[in-house]
Amino acid sequence: MASRGVVGIFLLSALPLLCLELRRGKPDLGIKDLILLCGRIFLLLALLTLIISVTTSWVNSFKPSQVYLKEEEEKNEKRQKLVRKKQQEAQGEKVSRYIENVLKPSQEMKLKKLEERFYQMTGETWKLSNGHKLGGDEDLELDSESQTSFETSNREAAKRRNLPNSVTNISPPAEQPTKKEVLDLPEEPPETAEEVVTVALRCPSGRVLRRRFFKSCSSQVLFDWMMKLGYRTSLYSLSTSFPRRPLEVEAGWSLQDIGITVDTVLNVEEKEQSS
């Protein structure tokens, strides 16, 4: 389009030249001279058109190359950004794996060694072992069970023996009118006293009750204690834990006489129903 416009401009500019040649005062200007003049003009126009077209194409040849270079640069930048992002992610994964698999275990090992050395220096190496609390089962049983099981246990035992309802409605020991059930236990000695043992009663409800006695106390005091807790001797008996056997007492025997010379756990058990 630009070359055509230029050709048109040169054609319009050639008309004045043609008019000037005609006005030079050559009356004998013939057809041959006009043809030569027009040929020169057209030759000049063709030459100019060729020059313009070549110049235009040469100038336009630089534009696509520049656009192509810009596109290539943008693609290269995007590619480099993507590569850098992948490298950063891979490096981050390597760092996290190193921290998790190497650095963290190493720090934990160093800390454990320092802790072991500290306890060895202070003489508290027992803290490095997995210990357990003594008597933990009994304490758990004591905490987990409720305090209201006296009348329930008596009532269930009476039902299994098909006893009348009047027997099951047993009042607390303190309210019993009979002299036998109003029991007075000896005063509990202090822990620092000599010749003292601790007796624990494991009740059917799961409770574990403890009390201190002098070894010289009568063995009958154990059954009095059981009665005061609400377990009648007609329904329940005492037995040792290991070996498991009924506790045998006699009148005039002390706790030391029946073998209770150290801290002991006794079981309150239901008596077997006689046929």
Swiss-Prot record:
Residues 192-268 form the UBX domain. The chain crosses the membrane at residues 2-22, 34-54. The keyword Transmembrane applies. It is found in: Endoplasmic reticulum membrane. It holds the Pfam family UBX. GO terms for molecular function: ubiquitin binding. GO terms for biological process: ERAD pathway. GO terms for cellular component: endoplasmic reticulum membrane; nucleolus; nucleoplasm. Disulfide bonds: none annotated. Residues 1, 55-275 are cytoplasmic. Keywords: Endoplasmic reticulum, Membrane, Transmembrane, Transmembrane helix. Residues 23-33 are lumenal. It is a multi-pass membrane protein. InterPro entries: Ubiquitin-like_domsf, UBX_dom, UBX_domain-protein, UBXN8. Interacts with SYVN1 and VCP. This is UBX domain-containing protein 8.
